[in-house]
Amino acid sequence: MSSSRTIIRGGLVITASDELHADILIEDGRVAALAAAGTSAAEAWTAERTIDATGKYVIPGGVDAHTHMELPFGGTFASDTFETGTRAAAWGGTTTIVDFAVQSVGHTLREGLDAWHAKAEGNCAIDYGFHMIVSDVHQETLKEMDLLVQEGVTSFKQFMAYPGVFYSDDGQILRAMQRSADNGGLIMMHAENGIAIDVLVEQALARGETDPRYHGEVRKALLEAEATHRAIKLAQVAGAPLYVVHVSAMEAVAELARARDEGLPVFGETCPQYLFLSTDNLAEPDFEGSKYVCSTPLRPREHQAKLWQGLRTDDLQVVSTDHCPFCFVGQKELGRGDFSKIPNGLPGVENRMDLLHQAVVDGHISRRRWIEIACANPARMFGMYPKKGTIAPGADADIVIYDPNAVQVVSADTHHMNVDYSAYEGKHVTGRVETVLSRGELVITEREYTGHAGHGTYTPRSTCQYLN
């Protein structure tokens, strides 16, 4: 039926592997064909809707493989719901998120997963999948991991941090890694030595060091590196692949690089906050620094160059946001007088694609690498490629028309995330999302929201495609 056909004409199509001036035919929510602009094949297409992308980039929708909508943390909840968070993601050119369902201690994986399905179903503007946070490893949990992999939840997050909440000890981590080595799942690790960090927190507070900047000082880069090294060795013993989340320290990048040089299936993710922000932000006066409290913490500025280098050399493969927003008023303020009570997390799901385009403008990465780390690699890593993460016949028509020349100023006044501040307030960025399609449906139309809650569907995933 012609009513479900769309043509995008005249744009520069950029994927992880190619840049070409091509027209795109979309049919029934999928990419049906690409043809060089101006050719007879492209000219022969007809459709009800034609989008003019002349002078623009045509890129795959972003895949943000690390978000926390409605996450309970520190006595409060992340301020974005699945409805507000996925709408904001669409505004930022992201068309798929993978969020984290949480197993609470004493409960089953299934109970946690069901709870997250209930939060998301019917509320999302874009497609979504789930990872599973495993906080209580025992024989029943391990059996459940096999079942979850079979139904498309193919990655499991463990924490070496947060004793008493999400923490797993080395024995629990090893057991889960052994299980994932057998069932094809991928262990995602929050690599920080939480036991040692808790000692440093206690000592800092006893000295009266209560301001937000001490959050960064106690969560030492060496303790991120140590935990990264330990996670790599445990994975090696288990014969399992490993994905280290939110890498922030150059010493941790060095551990990943060493493991990869040895040929181990070890992967790393970093986030825009570590590439663009630093401990200078944590030290902002009048408790403003609390806006930048996240874990792993922001590092001194000299770490940024090593993170960019890791992205260029493929020692880091993915940039996700770890989007976990808490309002300054009433939420971040819970930690006034005690930095350890500041809810950990930053808003960013709307900013990632633009910040990484700015990195292209600044010469840190190429255009294709931008698409690779923001779209293709996360889709491959988490079993969604080539349905997601690229523009090719058969792929979902998750497509962004991107204006590479528009200049914008990032601000809480104009963003769509449900949070009262921007981590990048006042930053000038070159490049802006103009139009977004999710499975061929217009979600953002020339800078206007035309999507709706419930369009986004749950996306089961296959196992990590880097290992196949």
Describe the residue ranges of each PLM region.
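Divalent metal-coordination and catalytic microenvironments
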Residues: 11, 24, 29, 55, ...
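Histidine/acidic residue-rich metal-binding segments in metalloenzymes
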Residues: 140-319, 335
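Histidine-rich, glycine-flanked metal-binding segment
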Residues: 1-60
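Metal-associated gating/positioning segment near the N- to mid-region
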Residues: 53-123, 140
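C-terminal cap of metal-dependent C-N hydrolases
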Residues: 11, 333-338, 393-459
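Short catalytic-loop micro-motif centered on adjacent basic/acidic residues
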Residues: 98-99, 129-132, 241-246
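His/Asp/Glu-enriched, well-ordered alpha-helical/loop segment
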Residues: 210-239, 313, 317-319, 325-406
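Alpha-helix-loop-beta-strand connector modules within alpha/beta enzyme cores
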Residues: 110-126, 174-189
